[in-house]
């Protein structure tokens, strides 16, 4: 197991690379989509009408972008584990089944080939129309640390998606006379299937793993659009669409734990590890489930993170694990302090994985569950 750190575009700086090394990370998961303004990484409420930001001017990333990123990261003593998330502008019509779908699919194929050629082994993505939306921000974590959470009763989950917005970002100007977007579960799965059947063979040739993030929040629907992977067993359905090592998972532990009706996630994590399809892992902890949960410090939620490490150890997982987002601590560098706490906790668990003893969960719980 290897420790990584996720950095947003504006946070891909020498100072943050140095911080990552100091905290024990060896790998970087880079977000090239510019979600936020300003230079400081932070949490996002994800609930404003216009979402996180405007990506309408984004140009498709190419080999030079990726090669420059890989060189910069390596020059700073680290390795690239993955890039995370396509800009919504690159695939809005793939998600919405719009008129530029074929053109955008071809663009994604070029992007995947260029990433593989540059030495980027994995691309994380989230096949979602509403995206990460509905959070609130407040002193929800231990010691009143700032964190994010979901209270579905406090928002209107059916608030229509503004025209020109997908994945919680504006990809073009809106039309005032446009009809609200509505998408059923069957329609969304059909779109995902068409996407995977087109791009996974290209990823195989390029030596790239496409790693799917589950829904966050994992509600049944948001903003008139169905959610996709909002139960752990739906990951199996996704992997079965194209049975390939390049059709993998961006395994977010917090999102799995948030899913309603899921008593425990340990058997699911073991099953996914046994299938050998985990691209990388978001090591995040939470308390509660949809419709009401909040994110916690990594040692203070409903997930036994030591048990997760035992399972990964037993199943031979040797990939990258990152903290994902964390609560912010009360100091002059709240983001860095929160990340440092999570990275230190993770490093201690992983360095002592052999001494953690046997797994405490029934290995038979990894029996596969069919999703329909």
Which residue ranges define each predicted feature?
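A short beta-strand-loop structural module common to alpha/beta enzyme folds
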Residues: 26-36
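Short beta-strand and adjacent tight-turn residues that come in two discontinuous sequence segments
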Residues: 30, 125, 322
